Amino acid sequence: MSNPVFLALDIPRLEAGKALVDKVKAHIGGVKLGMEFFYAHGHHGVHEIAHCGLPVFLDLKLHDIPNTVAAAMQSIHVLEPAIVTVHASGGRAMMEDAKAAAGENTKVVGVTMLTSLDERDLERTGVDGSPHDHVMRLAELAENAGLDGIVCSGQEVGAVHKQWKQGFFVVPGLRPAGSASGDQKRVVTPRQARDDGASVLVIGRPISKADDPEQAARDIEATL
């Protein structure tokens, strides 16, 4: 895609979200709608954002038994999302069924490790090894399950890209140089992630919380 930036629209009010997208749409490539937005506004909200004319990424992080996840994927066919997320830790069968149930033009990507987590967090959940090792294991599982790609931090995307040449890689938790990292622990700049093989760059607060969101989006676009 010509512009890999997807705006993370984590705004509870629909009209405010639409207004923000209208302001910045010339400088982004799509809009990511997460659980907060989807649970608040449902199918109607997705349709309203889609009217802005940009691809919609539904970041629903589906994680359940295979049959339930497949049914959930079928229920969002009508929304025609460009991308949908499932948790790679849900296992191969779940990912296979999710991909089989997805629309023909929808990319299904597996969430590997949230960018708010680090090695200590992994240890507390009983996962051995480094974040890098954990992401690489789940990336291999997602590839073998037939997914289009994965979600990973910018710190891992370079290594995953070398392992999975044809993969589609979504990188969240990005911060322009000089920005505060907030609750993100494994961050890089949008330019670095793109250079390392990211297909989609998910950027939220550096644009949505900026004094001038349009200028912030324009500045990020100029670095790519």
Swiss-Prot record:
Keywords: Decarboxylase, Lyase, Pyrimidine biosynthesis. It catalyses: orotidine 5'-phosphate + H(+) = UMP + CO2. Its EC number is 4.1.1.23. One of its GO terms (cellular component) is cytosol. Pathway: Pyrimidine metabolism; UMP biosynthesis via de novo pathway; UMP from orotate: step 2/2. The active site is at residue 61. InterPro entries: Aldolase_TIM, OMPdecase, OMPdecase_AS, OMPdecase_bac, OMPdeCOase_dom, RibuloseP-bd_barrel. Substrate binds at residues 10, 32, 59-68, 115, 175, 184, 204-205. It is an enzyme of class 4 (lyase). GO terms for molecular function: orotidine-5'-phosphate decarboxylase activity. It comes from the Bacteria. One of its GO terms (biological process) is 'de novo' UMP biosynthetic process. Belongs to the OMP decarboxylase family. Type 1 subfamily. HAMAP family: OMPdecase_type1_B (MF_01200_B). Homodimer. Catalyzes the decarboxylation of orotidine 5'-monophosphate (OMP) to uridine 5'-monophosphate (UMP). This is Orotidine 5'-phosphate decarboxylase. It comes from Erythrobacter litoralis (strain HTCC2594). The lineage of its organism: Bacteria, Pseudomonadati, Pseudomonadota, Alphaproteobacteria, Sphingomonadales. The gene is pyrF.
